[in-house]
Structure formats: structure tokens, C-alpha cells
């Protein structure tokens, strides 16, 4: 990889500096990692341009999750036809659902770039497996959904837990098993009589 005749090179390589100077003779591995990263960034740009405008290796549709003050753009995008990347993601989800047959599926959403994929999966689950309950937690809900009032998000998930997820998850499981009332849920948003 360091010899630069193994991977194709596109626009990210136009900005490349003198690698020998930057990494020296002892930095072959670091240099190879840097070149591989540039290749992956070029590949991501290509996929975004040609296949799916929301693509990102770890941040799918990140710009949609960044506008936490309004759910409108994200809601509209969730109702558009799926892209080939989303179709692949949903096919993987279907395999896991058929393999494990869960009654509860939870999504960890640490960053804005994980929100769209989690909601898209939740939407698909609600359409194809309406008896499965769907939970969501993680860093993004902790910071951006703390004061959620838009009930539309609950078309895609049933529960949003905040902060340390263990206690809310245990209470959610107790609630779903019929051992406690919904009012006993800890740090968890849900709809009760169409109100968050």
C-alpha cells in the first residue's frame, strides 16, 4: 500500500504531501494506514455521489440528525423510498430478526449520524414485525432528545431511554413482562394516550 501502486487514487490523493518526509523511513505502517484512509474517503465520496447521498462509513445521513430542533427533514426523508445501502442494511436486519426472533430490539445511537439508520430500521420493524417493541438510547438521545415532545418519533421507536441505560432497560423489561406499570419506567420516554 505504501508504494502507491496497489489502491486506486482519486481526489483525496491530490492533497497528499511528501509521505517520506511526513512519516520517515520508520513509518511505513502509519503511511499505509494514511493511504488506506484516503482510499476509503475517496470510496465514500464515490458512493455518496453515485449510489446514496446519505452514505457514510459510520455516519449515515448525519446532516439529518444534526437538526435536532426540528424532526421535519428527518421525518420527510424516512418516508422516501429506500436507497440500495438502506436496502442492504434492512436485509441484514431481517436476517437477524428471523434468526433470533426477538420481542424487543434496541438501537444504540451515539451520534447524529446513527439516528437515521436506527429510525429507518425501527420503521421497517414496525411495518414487518409490529409485535416487536423498539427501544433507543445512547449519546444522541441523552443530549438531543432530553426534552422531546414531537410524538412522530414514536412512529419509529416505542421507547427512548436516557443516561445510563442499564436501570431503564431493566425497568423496561419488567414493564414489557407485565411486572410494573408504565409510570414506573425510569428515564424513559414513550407515548401514553398519544402524548410523550
Region annotations inferred by a language model:
Residues 1-52:
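Non-catalytic, alpha-helical, charged scaffold/linker segments
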Residues 3, 8, 12-15, 62-196:
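Glycine-rich beta-alpha loop elements in corrinoid/cobalamin-binding modules
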Residues 26-29, 58, 67, 167:
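Compositionally biased, intrinsically disordered low-complexity regions
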Residues 34-75, 85-86:
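Short, compositionally biased "basic patch" segments
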